[in-house]
């Protein structure tokens, strides 16, 4: 089979969009299985799994497509190949796709743990920067480390989206691949269709598509950011790790069943269960029910505890 090195970057975008839709479908099925396990088991199960659902969904989808093309590759008419010194362009082997999958899995897991550390740091009153980093930063910056972590955590979705777009643009235009692991392994996408070499780089269209992603992310985050700060302006920053705050709450109920951390800004549903404000607000925005007893609960009925 003769393979041509030409490819339209828009084919890679189409491939990633379709693959992402498939991954989101698998993610929704995982959440459905968790709901079918019963309310209490569901809350405990999702409390541990929620940060890893995206990683698990991506791993399951990619693992099922190791020996075959993904849905995105089929639709975009592209294949994953590698440059061989003697044979030229050859199709990527199952082993190479497996290695790429493992690399991507490790990178995603590191990202999840960094995300958890940022969240814990923004909530913890005793958070300190690592010793090595404290030595590198000016004293004025160190004195405001808690505020820096809070700002970084608040605008993290926009920063991640911006980094993701820049990374994807560089990989697509220069490496003809979609992930860092593919670039490290020398894998790249090639088109099964004839591409005019002079028109294969539609930079303007590519920038418009990726720019629209960033704008959508900024608008979405701005709405949630202002919503959170409207609420935070009328609440104090209570953390139930301190037993002196809201002492009437039993010690066994001072951890959120959704994030499995000490409850931050405690809020109660109509049925009386207590969670972090951000956790239960996000939950009821998607499912109008209590995570523990499945009683009806809407975001407008959540009660902030003072």
Swiss-Prot record:
Residues on the Cytoplasmic side? 85-147, 220-306
Entry-linked CDD domains: RING-HC_PEX10
- Topological domains on the Peroxisomal matrix side lie at 1-52, 175-202
* Domain comment as written in the entry: The three subunits of the retrotranslocation channel (PEX2, PEX10 and PEX12) coassemble in the membrane into a channel with an open 10 Angstrom pore. The RING-type zinc-fingers that catalyze PEX5 receptor ubiquitination are positioned above the pore on the cytosolic side of the complex.
Output the Gene Ontology terms for molecular function: ubiquitin protein ligase activity; zinc ion binding
Any idea which UniProt keywords this protein has?
Answer: Membrane, Metal-binding, Peroxisome, Peroxisome biogenesis, Protein transport, Transferase, Transmembrane, Transmembrane helix, Transport, Ubl conjugation pathway, Zinc, Zinc-finger
Q: Specify the pathway.
A: Protein modification; protein ubiquitination
**Gene Ontology BP, a term:** protein ubiquitination
UniProt-annotated binding residues for Zn(2+) 1: 256, 259, 276, 279
Q: How does it sit in the membrane?
A: Multi-pass membrane protein
Q: What is this protein called?
A: Peroxisome biogenesis factor 10
Top-rank lineage group of the source organism: Eukaryota
Where located? Peroxisome membrane
Q: What is its EC number?
A: 2.3.2.27
Where do the ZnF regions (RING-type) fall? 256-294
Q: Which residues are listed for Zn(2+) 2 binding in this entry?
A: 271, 273, 290, 293
| SMART domains per the UniProt record, alphabetical | RING (SM00184)
The gene that this protein is the product of is pas4
Taxon lineage: Eukaryota, Fungi, Dikarya, Ascomycota, Taphrinomycotina
Residue ranges crossing the lipid bilayer per the database entry:
53-84, 148-174, 203-219
Relay the activity regulation note.
The E3 ubiquitin-protein ligase activity is stimulated by PEX12.
* Subunit annotation: Component of the PEX2-PEX10-PEX12 retrotranslocation channel, composed of PEX2, PEX10 and PEX12.
The task this protein performs is described as:
E3 ubiquitin-protein ligase component of a retrotranslocation channel required for peroxisome organization by mediating export of the PEX5 receptor from peroxisomes to the cytosol, thereby promoting PEX5 recycling. The retrotranslocation channel is composed of PEX2, PEX10 and PEX12; each subunit contributing transmembrane segments that coassemble into an open channel that specifically allows the passage of PEX5 through the peroxisomal membrane. PEX10 also regulates PEX5 recycling by acting as a E3 ubiquitin-protein ligase.
Q: Which reaction does it catalyse?
A: S-ubiquitinyl-[E2 ubiquitin-conjugating enzyme]-L-cysteine + [acceptor protein]-L-lysine = [E2 ubiquitin-conjugating enzyme]-L-cysteine + N(6)-ubiquitinyl-[acceptor protein]-L-lysine
Q: Which family does it belong to?
A: Belongs to the pex2/pex10/pex12 family.
